[in-house]
Amino acid sequence: DAGIATPDTTVYDRALIQDEEGNPWPMNDGKMPTGKAMSIKSGITSSVNTIAVQVMNMLTPQASYDFLTQRLGFEDSLVGTRTNADGTVQSDIDLAPLALGGLTDGVTVREMAGGFSTFINDGVFAGTRTYTKVLDSEGNVVLENNPGTELGFENVRTAYYMLDCMQAVTAYGTASGTTISGVETAGKTGTTTSNTDIWFCGVTP
């Protein structure tokens, strides 16, 4: 959305930094980066950690945090800066939390659903709703809960780019087993260390 990259932008499967023990970071599911060039779309399709971190570094964690909290509804879960009772400081404004999901408190399923819906709603963030309306016994509207019309993306093309990448994920990427016969699907997988948690967030555009 910032005009910095597109799905076809070439990036490299390589570590960005070294960790405290001198090991390259990030790794790809415990494997060393290959150093090969690939498109951002290919990185998303194959869930390559190094590509996610390279792109986040291009965008900057601060800009990404601001976008998520101000335009995609994640303001209640993401931690800007928190000082704990023992004096330690925590923040989600960094590469690992925002590029790889290593968040301080995590996010909710509802927030993820709201964020993903932006990709199939022409870039508009409509929020999330538990109900649309309530009728009385005669069919009169008692309560109505209309969707929001806040702009998630400045450029609607960004939503289309992301949707195209996520359609590749379900077509032939890490979520290729989630296709539904006769229905278009798109989504993104995510795992924690040793596959303790396995996530999939998807849409049917």
Regions found by a protein language model. Give the residues of each.
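Extended, hydrophobic alpha-helical segments in both membrane/secreted and soluble proteins
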Residues: 1-2, 7, 51-52, 64, ...
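Conserved catalytic neighborhood of penicillin-recognizing serine enzymes
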Residues: 5-64, 95, 137-168
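A penicillin-recognizing enzyme superfamily signal
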Residues: 6-7, 105-205
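A short secondary-structure junction motif
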Residues: 18, 47, 71-76, 122, ...
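Structured DNA-binding interfaces in DNA transaction proteins
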Residues: 20, 101, 128
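Mid-domain, small-residue-enriched loop/turn segments at the edges of structured enzyme/sensor domains
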Residues: 24-28, 60-112
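Secondary-structure capping and boundary motifs in well-ordered enzyme cores
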Residues: 32, 36, 40, 44, ...
